[in-house]
């Protein structure tokens, strides 16, 4: 199972680097920061499906 450490999040702003991750909601997040912010917003219900686009 792929995991991402989101312990340093949320962050107020994310960089624009493009390293896509696919969330358990079947949405592609552009990078770890945007994914981790969404994980925090979901109260931990969002998980990583896999690295790369959904």
UniProtKB/Swiss-Prot annotation:
Coiled-coil spans in chain: none
Compartmental location: Secreted
GO molecular function: serine-type endopeptidase inhibitor activity
Feature type site, description Reactive bond 3: 16-17
GO-annotated cellular components: extracellular region
Alphabetized UniProt keyword annotations: Disulfide bond, Glycoprotein, Protease inhibitor, Repeat, Secreted, Serine protease inhibitor
Disulfide bonding pattern of the chain: 6-36, 14-33, 22-54
Glycosylated residues, chain numbering: 43
InterPro entries xref list: Bifunctional_prot_inhibitor, Kazal_dom, Kazal_dom_sf, Prot_inh_Kazal-m
Domain spans labelled Kazal-like: 4-54
Comment field on protein domains: Avian ovomucoid consists of three homologous, tandem Kazal family inhibitory domains.
Name the UniProt record assigns to this protein: Ovomucoid
Upper classification of the organism: Eukaryota, Metazoa, Chordata, Craniata, Vertebrata
């Amino acid at each position: 199972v792929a995991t991402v450490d989101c312990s340093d999040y949320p962050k107020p702003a994310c960089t624009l680097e493009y390293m896509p991750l696919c969330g358990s909601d079947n949405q592609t997040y552009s990078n770890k920061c945007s994914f981790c912010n969404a994980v925090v917003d979901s109260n931990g219900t969002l998980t990583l499906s896999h690295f790369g686009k959904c």
